[in-house]
A protein has these predicted regions:
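Structured beta-strand/loop patches that form or line metal/cofactor-binding pockets in enzymes
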Residues: 1-7
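Active-site- and interface-proximal helix/loop "cap" or "latch" segments in soluble metabolic
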Residues: 18-84
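Short, acidic, Ser/Thr-enriched surface-loop or helix-capping motifs
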Residues: 11-12
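C-terminal charged interaction modules
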Residues: 77-108
């Protein structure tokens, strides 16, 4: 069985993203618009992370700060599920709290 996630990027004449959409047919998502995306892929052969970080030119800075904070929080959750390392997860969560405090982000 295969599952497919599709990312589409519309660029302006300077190759700057104007519109980002994504689809995941298995999840019932079709051409859902996004203002930012981060994709990380582990290359086991070279032992390095390959990344694609995209955001539209109209992405507000305050939303970008929230996006980064929420990404850091979910990365710490994923780290815990993948490693069961409670001590490092707590350290990562502390950093997330510090990050939010310094950016004066309100917790929802």
């Amino acid at each position: 069985m295969n599952s497919k996630i599709e990312l589409n990027v519309e660029l302006d004449e300077n190759r700057v993203p104007e519109k980002l959409t994504w689809s995941a047919q298995d999840g019932g998502i079709q051409n859902e618009e996004a203002k930012a995306m981060m994709l990380s892929v582990w290359d086991s052969n070279t032992q390095e992370t390959l990344r694609i970080d995209l955001w539209t030119k109209d992405m507000p800075v305050d939303e970008m700060k929230q996006f980064f904070h929420q990404t850091l929080v979910t990365m710490s959750d994923t780290f815990m599920r993948a490693t069961q390392d409670e001590k490092m997860t707590a350290t990562m969560k502390d950093f997330c709290d510090y990050f939010a405090e310094k950016l004066e982000l309100k917790k929802n």
